[in-house]
Amino acid sequence: RFVDNALTIQQLVEEAWEKTCGKAVQTVLHVQIADRINETRTVRCRCDCLTKAEIREREIAEYDAARLRERRRRECFRVTDPKKQELAGNMEKWTFANDDRKRPDLSDAMQRYVEQFQEHRRESRGLLLYGDVGTGKTYLAACIANAVIDQGHTARMTNFASIGNELQQTWEKQEYIDELCKYDLLIIDDLGTERKSEYMQEIVFNVIDARYRAGGPLIITTNLTTDELSKPGEIGYSRIYDRILERCLAVKGDGQSRRRQAAIKGWEKMRQQLGMEVHAH
């Protein structure tokens, strides 16, 4: 008897038997191949018991993975304000599949960002979604968060009002910020709507600066205009926005993207990767 190219089977030994059905599930073949004597190959046999066990094992693994994704999703949109619990629950369902695609160019670009997330994560490249109220910036940011969670990553979506409240409730402020920066993707929603005070400005800077230094992509949504971002009027906010614009591609909420001239160069390549047109500032 021969196997493949004149492989002479010398012995059939060491069969392993399935205890339930009594069928062989593994056979070790000692074969002679050219000048190699007694080379061992293991041939796996199939039986219904083994197949059922493997299916069950796969089902358990898929169930555990689904539970992990849902746990990460709840953590991503977690809020401490009881009035916002319902909104947080809804955000878990904000996905590209449910997108109304009123801005198809922008939706497609955001999906490409997710598809290329490994590269953008490695290069610490994020997005600054800016534009008028109601243009879907928060929705698309949540879509990105849900999509990267489905890929197996961690994400956290929050805002500086919530961060400020949570920091007031802990003595370990730096530890809190460090934990915030450990997520694979950090999303800050509604930048600029937090109350204006020296204390809050310090919080905003500390979080942005910590993420900047730690690396990893940052996504920001804001109603601020590019003029307000480039000329904030306060030195404190100027250094904050400079860090954001160094690491985040500015994308207008209506689907058109723009690049601040003073920001880091080289965004053209990323625009091409996302399939977006290049516009002059």
Question: What does each model-identified segment do?
Answer:
Residues 124-128, 155, 185, 217:
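Residue-level preference for the first positions of well-ordered beta-strands
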Residues 1-105, 261-281:
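A short, basic N-terminal segment
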Residues 122-123, 151, 180-183, 211-215:
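Short loop/turn elements that form and flank the Walker-type P-loop nucleotide-binding site
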Residues 109-121:
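Pre-Walker A adenine-sensing motif
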Residues 121-141:
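Walker A/P-loop nucleotide-binding motif
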Residues 102-111, 145-185, 195-202:
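Short glycine-rich substrate-engagement loop in P-loop NTPases that contacts/grips substrate
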Residues 157, 187-189, 217-223:
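Structural recognition of the conserved hydrophobic beta-strand(s) that form the central parallel beta-sheet
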